[in-house]
Amino acid sequence: MSDNDTIVAQATPPGRGGVGILRISGFKAREVAETVLGKLPKPRYADYLPFKDADGSVLDQGIALWFPGPNSFTGEDVLELQGHGGPVILDLLLKRILTIPGLRIARPGEFSERAFLNDKLDLAQAEAIADLIDASSEQAARSALNSLQGAFSARVNHLVEALTHLRIYVEAAIDFPDEEIDFLSDGKIEAQLNDVIADLDAVRAEARQGSLLREGMKVVIAGRPNAGKSSLLNALAGREAAIVTDIAGTTRDVLREHIHIDGMPLHIIDTAGLREASDEVERIGIERAWQEIEQADRVLFMVDGTTTDAVDPAEIWPEFIARLPAKLPITVVRNKADITGETLGMSEVNGHALIRLSARTGEGVDVLRNHLKQSMGFDTNMEGGFLARRRHLQALEQAAEHLQQGKAQLLGAWAGELLAEELRLAQQNLSEITGEFTSDDLLGRIFSSFCIGK
């Protein structure tokens, strides 16, 4: 298998459909056109032609599109054949194309990978293709499209350019120490560095929003049996996703629901009631519940309001609170307000949010929805956002750390050489986002998660 091979893959989903598309990219795409179509179509014009088998018989007829490189998606010669979407027809056409020597089936994401390697897309834009396909809400789709059109890359490239100018200034000060003006201590470098740090902080804030849109927030509902956890899951999901009975221990396994709150994806997880297990099945369910809790972004601690008047989680169930991971955010949810007569709404107890509601009637659930949105700092009014992946957040965080360390070197010891090195490392971190500085292993992991025809 060579990266110089001509590749072919189905670009439409498998199964039956009105249209099925095969995409070919590489230097032999021209030969495929001449062999299967009998002619080379006019570049970038739709040509209605028969698709022929090796014996000259017609396999199908449809639209052929010819994009000679470098003016194509991949930067190579690209041919697209748009025929009928029957799986048998597409399979016959694919087999016909593969009889031509030098062609092979594309690896997942190989078309996008070639576009990246041929400088048609940077890495952040290439990732945005997969994110656009996988978008689970309108806002996520719009943000992914912004990334594909270069919004995220432009912000990163602006930071890289600012760091480049700052590095030139710092290294000039190091190389010419005998000048009358001390460039390191005259305040200009500190001012420029502060500007870059402020710009980076703004990009990090937008990237966290983008990561929320892409990754979502994992919220685990936990508590004792019969506290109303499954009822709350159903209320948040807007459907009967979980079985609800008065029998303690009805939920034995983990239940998952994917919902959206004003465009923000939430992974809501209902768990088995936590207690001493009465049998092996319940024990496994409780074990899985704790595994989910340990991986959660937030825990909704469900409390049956008819069993206690306490509101402090450490007073309600100290053993449960003690076992939770450090710094895991907790929201105390006092359920069954329709029975206790408690006032619906939200307050705060010892640093924890407290919400009183009725999962059965749905009263107060909107307060919880708004709280979940606010707790992650999600801004639905932010325009022109972009999607961000975990690796993007890590690169931005590392760049910010290097800039802060560089600032400390500048202000603490006027150490120009150490500042220059921190600036170089920050620039390297940012360049990893767009792929200007990226390992082959990382590229392999990214593109292997794509669709075959992308």
UniProtKB/Swiss-Prot annotation:
Residues 216-377 form the TrmE-type G domain. Its EC number is 3.6.-.-. Changing residue 252 to A: 7-fold decrease in GTPase activity and 6-fold increase of affinity. One of its GO terms (cellular component) is cytosolic tRNA wobble base thiouridylase complex. PROSITE patterns: G_TRME. Changing residue 251 to S: 4-fold decrease in GTPase activity and 1.2-fold decrease of affinity. Optimum pH is 7.5-9.5. The keyword Cytoplasm applies. It is an enzyme of class 3 (hydrolase). It is found in: Cytoplasm. (6S)-5-formyl-5,6,7,8-tetrahydrofolate binds at residues 23, 80, 120, 454. Gene3D superfamilies: P-loop containing nucleotide triphosphate hydrolases, Probable tRNA modification gtpase trme, domain 1, tRNA modification GTPase MnmE domain 2. Its cofactor is K(+). GTP binds at residues 226-231, 245-251, 270-273, 335-338, 358-360. SUPFAM superfamilies: P-loop containing nucleoside triphosphate hydrolases (SSF52540), TrmE connector domain (SSF116878). Keywords: Cytoplasm, GTP-binding, Hydrolase, Magnesium, Metal-binding, Nucleotide-binding, Potassium, tRNA processing. One of its GO terms (biological process) is response to pH. Mg(2+) binds at residues 230, 251. K(+) binds at residues 226, 245, 247, 250. Changing residue 282 to A: 1900-fold decrease in GTPase activity. Changing residue 451 to S: No change in GTP binding and hydrolase activity. Does not affect association to the cell inner membrane. Completely impairs tRNA modifying function. Homodimer. Heterotetramer of two MnmE and two MnmG subunits. This is tRNA modification GTPase MnmE. It comes from Escherichia coli (strain K12).
